[in-house]
């Protein structure tokens, strides 16, 4: 099966995908302009308004509004101008998608990165993989959950019990 080729303009390579080790079945990222559609991701989103390639051009706000608020704010404040320059926007923020016709919902892929997927023996009812990130409110809530249930759950991650292939 042939893959659909996107020109990817992103600060990350997204290799093999936007979810680390989960290789896309239908998409191939092209970093040299050989694809059929241009996709400007998160921190490169504003570069899309200067695209003169003539190819369909989209912005993908892959990160949440809490992580890249300045890009969401600029795009939404200048929505009519941005939409006059591109073909559409993808976002994982449902409230933004409901409010703006040109913004489509695109779920952020958070598939597990576990290489050897199986059901492992547990010492407690629930296990959780968590990081110590504190970049937004959701991160803080996760860490509050960790503190509250520290003795009732098995925690894994860089800070707790590091695993090499999460």
Stretches with model-predicted labels:
Residues 1-166:
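Nucleotide-sugar donor-binding catalytic core of glycosyltransferases
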């Amino acid at each position: 099966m042939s893959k659909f080729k996107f020109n990817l303009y992103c600060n990350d390579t997204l290799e093999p995908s936007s979810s680390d080790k989960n290789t896309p079945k239908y998409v191939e990222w092209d970093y040299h302009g050989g694809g059929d559609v241009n996709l400007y991701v998160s921190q490169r989103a504003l570069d899309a308004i200067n695209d003169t390639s003539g190819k369909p051009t989209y912005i993908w706000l892959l990160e949440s509004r809490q992580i890249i608020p300045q890009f969401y704010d600029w795009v939404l404040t200048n929505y009519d101008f941005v939409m006059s320059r591109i073909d559409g926007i993808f976002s994982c923020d449902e409230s933004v998608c409901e409010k703006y016709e040109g913004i489509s919902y695109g779920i952020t892929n958070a598939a597990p990165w576990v290489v050897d997927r199986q059901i492992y023996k547990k010492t407690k009812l629930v296990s959780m993989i968590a990081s110590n990130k504190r970049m937004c409110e959701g991160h803080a809530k996760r860490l509050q959950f960790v503190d509250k249930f520290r003795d009732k759950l098995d925690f894994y991650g860089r800070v707790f019990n590091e695993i090499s292939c999460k």
